[in-house]
């Protein structure tokens, strides 16, 4: 059995970190599942989220709810990329940062990596967060 590419795929990250690549797609249910997976990991937990696209009028509310879910799950750090992810970051509060520039996000994230860190990257395919994954894997 082989997992589908970029769907909860565990990879070796830089500085001995672990990366869970779930960058292929995103919707509210899949995001909740990803949060649950990350919450069960050992060590410092970092979640990188991109926008959930195609939610229409529900977009703002769904992204705010996600921020609360991530915080309540005990995730240590949240990094957001995309217009709606700004709302997710705002709901999470302390230890969350929003980026408009993907390269700045990659630079900041890379500086946080160590052997005690697990990073989960999740967003709609259109956000191209696979670029973040490719930059932080060993």
Question: Where are the regions that the model predicts?
Answer:
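ATP-dependent carboxylate-amine ligase
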Residues: 1-138
């Amino acid at each position: 059995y082989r997992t589908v590419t970029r769907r909860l795929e565990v990879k070796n990250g830089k500085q001995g970190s672990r990366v869970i690549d779930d960058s292929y797609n995103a919707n509210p249910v899949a995001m909740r599942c990803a949060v649950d997976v990350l919450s069960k990991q050992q060590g410092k937990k970092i979640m990188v989220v991109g926008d959930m696209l195609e939610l229409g009028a529900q977009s703002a509310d769904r992204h705010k709810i996600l921020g609360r879910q991530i915080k309540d799950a005990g995730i240590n750090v949240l990094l957001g990329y995309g217009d709606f992810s700004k709302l997710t970051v705002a709901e999470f509060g302390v230890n969350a940062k929003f980026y408009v520039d993907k390269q700045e996000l990659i630079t900041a994230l890379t500086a946080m990596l160590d052997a005690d860190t697990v990073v989960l990257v999740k967003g709609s395919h259109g956000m191209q967060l696979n670029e973040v994954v490719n930059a932080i894997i060993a």
